[in-house]
C-alpha cells in the first residue's frame, strides 16, 4: 500500500502530487485494471504476442526512417 506523510509547512497539493507519483510508480492502478476480470491464458498469450509484434514493427519503422 502506498502511503505519504505530510511534511511541516507542506501544502496539500504538494502532498497529493507526491502521493500520485508514488501511486503510479508502484503500479497500483495498472495491477487493478489487469485483475479486474479474468483473461484465459491462451488469450493472454495471444495479446502478448500481438503487442510484441506491434512493438517490433514500430521499432523497425523508426530504424528505417
Curated annotation (Swiss-Prot):
GO biological process per UniProt: translation
Matching Gene3D superfamilies: Ribosomal protein S8
Domain of life: Bacteria
Compositionally biased spans, kind Basic residues: 48-57
Region (Disordered): 45-65
InterPro entries, A to Z: Ribosomal_bS21, Ribosomal_bS21_sf
Statement: the UniProt record of this protein carries the keyword rRNA-binding: no
GO molecular-function term, one example from the UniProt record: structural constituent of ribosome
Entry keywords, A to Z: Ribonucleoprotein, Ribosomal protein
Annotated Pfam families: Ribosomal_S21
Keyword Ribosomal protein: yes
GO cellular component assignments: ribonucleoprotein complex; ribosome
Family: Belongs to the bacterial ribosomal protein bS21 family.
HAMAP family, per database record: Ribosomal_bS21 (MF_00358)
Protein name: Small ribosomal subunit protein bS21
Gene designation: rpsU
Amino acid at each position: 500500500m502506498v502511503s505519504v506523510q505530510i511534511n511541516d509547512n507542506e501544502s496539500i497539493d504538494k502532498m497529493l502530487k507526491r502521493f500520485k507519483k508514488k501511486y503510479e510508480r508502484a503500479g497500483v492502478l495498472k495491477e487493478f485494471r489487469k485483475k479486474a476480470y479474468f483473461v484465459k491464458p491462451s488469450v493472454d498469450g495471444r495479446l502478448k504476442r500481438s503487442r510484441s509484434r506491434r512493438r517490433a514493427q514500430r521499432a523497425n519503422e523508426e530504424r528505417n526512417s
